C-alpha cells in the first residue's frame, strides 16, 4: 500500500484485515467508507479511518483512493493519496491529521473531509463519501425555539404543545433482512450476507429484537429473488413454497403488530439486483414480485415483473397503490429507464417516497449502536430530486446479522397526526405525504417549514418565502452547523447551498424549486429534513 499527502509529509498508515467471507453474488460490490471524527482528540489531532471491502472478490485488486480536506466554502486545503490491496478481506487505513495546514494551525470552522476511491481496472464506478468536521470552536448557528414532538411513549394520546406542530414522531429502521432471504445470521457467525433461507432467525425474531431495542417500526425487506433458496436460479425449487413463505412473512408482521400496539411490524420486499439494476423497497405489497422460474417454468412469485424494468415496475406500483424507497442508490448505472440512470417517470415519482441518505454497514455485528462504518448517498438522492422525484430522506441499517436496529443510533422519523394510531395505513399515508426526516441520532428531530407549511408539501407561492429549520437535539446535543439546500426539479443540475442559517426569508425566482435542511450536531451526527416543493408565481 502506498500513500502520499500534499502539502504535508507522508504519515504512517495502519492497515488491518478482517476475515474473508464468501458472499452471494447479490452483494458482490465495492464498498468504501470514511470515518471522520467531528471533534479533535488530544490537542488538534485526529485520525480519519478509511474502510475498503469487496464481498465476493474473485481476484486481488488495487484500490486507488484520495482524501481531501476542504475549508469552509469548499476550497481544498489538503489532499492525501494512496493505494490499498484487496485480497478478499476488509481493509482499514488510518490517516492521521495534525490539525495543521502547512506550518499553521487550521483556522476554526466547519470543514469537509471527502473520500474518493476506485478499484483499478474493475469497471465499477468510483465511491465518494463526505463528512463535516469541526476545527477549533466554530460559532454556533442561532436556532429558533422548537418544542420536540411527542414520541411513541406519549402518542397518540399526547396533545401537541401550544403553538406546536400536531404530529407525533415514530422512529423506524425501514430496511433489514431475515432468514427469508440472506439475513438473520447469528452475530458470532455473521461475516456477510448469508446463503438464502439458511440463517437461524426469521421475521418474528427480528420484530421482537427491534421492539426490545426501542424502535417503533421495523421493516423486514427481503430480497424478492431469493425465495427459491438461491441467489441465482434453482431449477428444482418449489414455486408454491416460495409464494407461501412470502405470505407467512406478511402474517408474521400482522400478528406481531396486533399483539403489540404501538409497534409496527412491516414485511415487504427489496426488489431488484444491485449490479446493473438497483435495489428498492416496496413496503405494502401483499404480492411477491419476481422473474425467476424453476425447471417446470413455474414463476417463483405471485406476479411477474421483468428483471431490471423499472418503468414497468413503477407503473405496476402505481396501479396497486404501493409505496417504495430507493435503497443505497449509486449515482450511475442504477434505476435505468431507456438507458438513463436514476431516470424520472411520472409513475415512479408517484410511488417512490423515500431515498436512503445514510446507512450503517449492512454486515455490522455491533449491538451497542456504535458502528463507525457508514455509507453516504446524499449526492445520489440529490440527483433523483433534480430529476424530478419527490422523495424524502431516510436512514436505515440494512441489517443482515441479528442486530436489527442496534448497529447505530440512526433512525427514520415518521410523523403521524396527533390522535392517530400508528398502523400500516397511517405509516403509508405519512410516506405519501413525505412527512419524514432522517436522523443519525435517535433522540433528535428536524422539521422544515415553509411559510408555515410542513416539509413534504407541494404548494404555489407568491411573494416572499420564509424557511425555518426546527431542530430539537437529544440531551446535551446542540446544532453545530446548518445548511438549507436548494434545487430545481427536472433541471438535472446541481443542488446548492442557499443558506447557513436556521431561518431564511427571500423571494424565489419564478418556476419550480425544492428546499431541504441539513443539521450537523456538535457530536457529528447529521439530520436531514424532507424537502418542500414550491412553485413560485
Regions found by a protein language model. Give the residues of each.
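C-terminal functional module detector
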Residues: 59, 112-126, 136-147, 152-168, ...
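Signal that preferentially marks extracellular ectodomain short beta-strand elements
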Residues: 94-108, 503-507
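Domain-core and long-helix interface of multi-subunit machines
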Residues: 299-405, 475-494, 507, 513, ...
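Contiguous beta-strand segments within globular domains
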Residues: 28-64, 459-468
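A metal-dependent hydrolase metal-coordination microenvironment
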Residues: 149-320, 326-327, 334-336, 365, ...
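Histidine/acidic-residue-rich catalytic or RNA/ligand-binding cores of hydrolases
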Residues: 230-231, 277-279, 334-342, 402-418
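A glycine-anchored, Pro-Gly-centered beta-turn/N-cap motif
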Residues: 89-91, 107-111, 511-513
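Solvent-exposed serine/threonine-rich low-complexity stretches and specific carbohydrate-binding patches
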Residues: 77-95, 493-502
Amino acid at each position: 500500500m502506498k500513500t502520499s499527502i500534499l502539502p504535508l509529509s507522508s504519515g504512517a498508515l495502519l492497515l488491518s484485515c478482517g476475515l474473508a467471507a464468501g458472499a452471494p453474488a447479490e452483494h458482490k460490490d465495492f464498498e468504501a467508507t470514511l470515518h471522520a471524527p467531528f471533534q479533535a482528540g488530544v490537542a488538534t489531532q485526529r485520525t480519519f479511518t478509511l474502510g475498503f471491502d469487496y464481498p465476493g472478490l474473485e481476484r486481488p485488486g488495487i484500490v486507488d483512493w484520495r482524501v481531501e480536506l476542504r475549508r469552509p466554502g469548499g476550497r481544498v486545503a489538503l489532499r492525501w493519496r494512496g493505494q490499498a490491496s484487496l485480497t478478499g478481506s476488509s481493509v482499514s487505513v488510518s490517516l492521521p491529521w495534525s490539525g495543521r495546514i502547512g506550518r499553521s494551525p487550521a483556522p476554526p470552522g466547519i470543514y469537509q473531509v471527502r473520500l474518493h476511491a476506485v478499484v483499478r481496472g474493475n469497471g465499477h464506478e468510483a465511491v465518494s463519501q463526505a463528512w463535516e468536521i469541526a476545527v477549533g470552536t466554530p460559532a454556533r448557528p442561532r436556532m429558533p425555539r422548537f418544542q420536540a414532538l411527542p414520541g411513541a411513549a406519549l402518542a397518540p394520546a399526547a396533545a401537541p404543545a401550544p403553538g406546536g406542530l400536531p404530529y407525533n414522531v415514530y422512529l423506524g429502521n425501514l430496511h433489514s433482512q431475515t432468514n427469508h432471504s440472506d439475513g438473520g445470521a447469528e452475530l458470532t457467525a455473521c461475516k456477510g450476507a448469508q446463503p438464502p433461507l439458511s440463517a437461524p432467525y426469521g421475521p418474528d425474531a427480528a420484530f421482537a429484537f427491534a421492539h426490545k431495542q426501542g424502535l417503533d417500526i421495523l421493516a423486514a425487506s427481503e430480497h424478492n429473488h431469493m425465495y427459491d433458496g438461491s441467489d441465482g436460479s434453482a431449477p428444482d425449487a418449489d414455486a408454491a413454497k416460495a409464494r407461501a413463505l412470502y405470505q407467512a412473512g406478511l402474517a408474521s408482521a400482522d400478528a406481531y403488530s396486533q399483539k403489540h400496539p404501538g409497534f409496527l411490524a412491516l414485511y415487504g420486499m427489496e426488489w431488484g439486483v444491485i449490479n446493473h439494476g438497483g435495489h428498492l423497497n416496496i413496503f405494502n405489497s401483499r404480492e411477491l414480485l419476481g422473474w425467476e422460474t424453476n425447471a417446470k417454468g413455474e414463476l417463483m412469485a405471485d406476479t411477474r415483473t421483468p428483471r431490471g424494468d423499472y418503468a414497468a415496475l413503477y407503473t405496476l406500483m402505481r396501479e396497486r397503490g404501493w409505496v417504495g424507497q430507493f435503497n443505497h442508490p449509486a449515482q450511475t448505472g442504477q434505476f435505468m429507464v431507456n438507458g438513463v440512470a436514476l431516470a424520472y417517470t411520472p409513475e415512479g415519482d408517484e410511488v417512490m417516497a423515500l431515498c436512503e441518505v445514510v446507512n450503517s454497514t449492512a454486515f455490522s455485528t455491533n449491538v451497542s449502536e456504535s458502528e463507525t462504518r457508514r455509507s453516504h448517498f446524499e449526492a445520489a438522492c440529490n440527483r433523483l430530486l433534480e430529476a424530478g422525484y419527490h422523495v424524502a430522506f431516510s436512514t436505515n441499517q440494512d441489517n443482515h446479522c441479528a442486530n436489527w436496529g442496534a448497529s447505530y443510533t440512526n433512525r427514520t422519523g415518521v410523523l403521524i397526526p396527533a390522535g392517530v394510531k400508528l398502523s400500516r395505513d397511517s405509516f403509508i399515508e405519512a410516506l405519501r405525504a413525505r412527512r419524514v426526516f432522517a436522523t443519525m441520532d435517535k433522540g433528535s428531530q428536524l422539521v422544515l417549514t415553509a411559510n408555515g407549511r410542513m416539509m413534504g408539501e407541494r404548494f404555489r407561492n407568491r411573494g416572499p418565502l420564509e424557511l425555518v429549520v426546527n431542530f430539537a437535539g437529544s440531551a446535551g446535543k446542540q446544532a453545530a452547523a446548518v445548511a438549507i439546500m436548494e434545487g430545481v426539479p427536472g433541471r438535472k443540475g446541481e443542488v446548492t447551498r442557499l443558506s447557513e442559517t436556521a431561518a431564511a426569508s427571500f423571494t424565489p425566482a419564478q418556476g419550480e424549486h425544492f428546499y431541504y435542511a441539513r443539521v450537523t450536531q456538535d457530536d457529528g451526527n447529521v439530520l436531514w429534513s424532507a424537502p418542500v416543493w414550491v412553485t413560485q408565481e
